Amino acid sequence: MSTRAYRGRSPEQRVAERRERLLAAGLDLWSELGWSGVSVRGVCARSGLTDRYFYESFDDRDALLLAVFDRVRDELTGRLLAVPFTGEPRAVMRAMFTTLITALADDPRHARIAFTEPAGSPALETRRHDALLAVAGAVAEGVSSVAPVPPGGVRGPALFCVGGVGGLISAWLAGRHPATPEELAESCTDLCARVFGV
């Protein structure tokens, strides 16, 4: 790779910019076609880059898909962790669910990536499972900071809530659970409050 600046940008900056274009194209295509509809050729066409630049940043299509998934996961988890874990437990839960549902409504592409099953892709299935555990950890941290810890700890109830909320949000996104975002956040809060006994 050249070490010269080009149009005022270093080689590293140009690589990073191309990677961002590829990630944006992958996000768009995945949200439109599902993960199995994403191809190296399609990503290159959408980003306006050649496959040479694709392979500069990613080993293969799966590496791109994992990077897109990680970006969505990190953004959603970051928003959840920004919710103040203080106050009445139900208020904390409601704030977390409102934050999550608002984020999904703000960028529906994230909803498809975060809440559709990646069946047929072992790498994506593993990553999605790991994300479920990470979000459950955030929920457990938030709830345990404002509510008594139930017998047996908070991990099991947190996993149960996150899985159930994921199913409810998936049904909502598919139009099978009619509700406003506010009603959905309230339903999620009610269900999880019962699980945690608060």
How should these model regions be labeled?
Residues 1-5, 102, 141, 171-198:
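C-terminal peripheral helix-coil segments that are non-catalytic and often amphipathic
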Residues 1-17, 147:
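N-terminal intrinsically disordered/low-complexity leader segments
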